[in-house]
Amino acid sequence: QKMDADFRNMFGRWVKEQKKIGNKIFLVTGSDKKKTIQQIGIPLWRFVDGCYQNCGNQLYHKGRLIKQSSWRMSAELRLLIVTIMEKSLWYGVADTNINERVGMVNISTIGRGCTAEQRKSYCDWDKQSLERESIARIIRAVHPELDAAIGGQISIDVYPKGKDKAQVLDDMEGETIFFGDTCEIGGNDYPIAKKTDFYYNVSSPEETQRLLETNSR
């Protein structure tokens, strides 16, 4: 979803203030470059000290590609994913069920092309049915060399073990503080949350803004 203009302006000012006192700000997301720019805009994407795309499997700095993973999804994994998703009540609602990205694959039974209303309906349903949790568990069981974690409201991120968001910490120096919305076990923010010095598990832009503006950590 696109970042609200008021939040984007607030965040841009906050990043500028943090840079003045010597802190570095990085974005870590499961989304690819194109989607991230759609969400936050090119100016902010370039302004931060770095943007880790695809769960840390690709790094951009000031718009320049620094490094990226070479992992690709196998035919066997694709077949497994399709077989699982075809059994879902939500399969076929929208397009883009499988989205191959650098170093990972993002899957969604309802499809990333769903409307905002469909997204909310699926998200509410999934909280009760735990469909995504079940799918992730199956993928990990069949492919123990891979990890699968819940991401956002409708999808699952799949990548080689150890190639999750926590890998970005290898590039960090000093104390690290992380903000994420899926920091619980099974979420794609959990690996980095459990290894960082401190983290906030946020549930809305409003909560994130309040913490940024009022917390001294």
List the predicted regions and their residue ranges.
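Asp-based phosphoryl-transfer active-site loop
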Residues: 1-6, 27, 169, 189
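Conserved acidic, metal-coordinating active-site core of Asp-based
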Residues: 92-177, 183-185
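A generic structural motif
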Residues: 20-25, 144-150, 196-197
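Alpha-helix C-terminal capping segments
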Residues: 18, 40-43, 84-88, 139-143, ...
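Residues at the C-termini of beta-strands that transition into short coil/loop
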Residues: 52-55, 152, 203
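Mg2+-dependent phosphoryl-transfer enzymes with acidic/Ser/Thr/Gly-rich catalytic loops
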Residues: 157-217
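Active-site phosphate-binding/coordination module
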Residues: 7-97
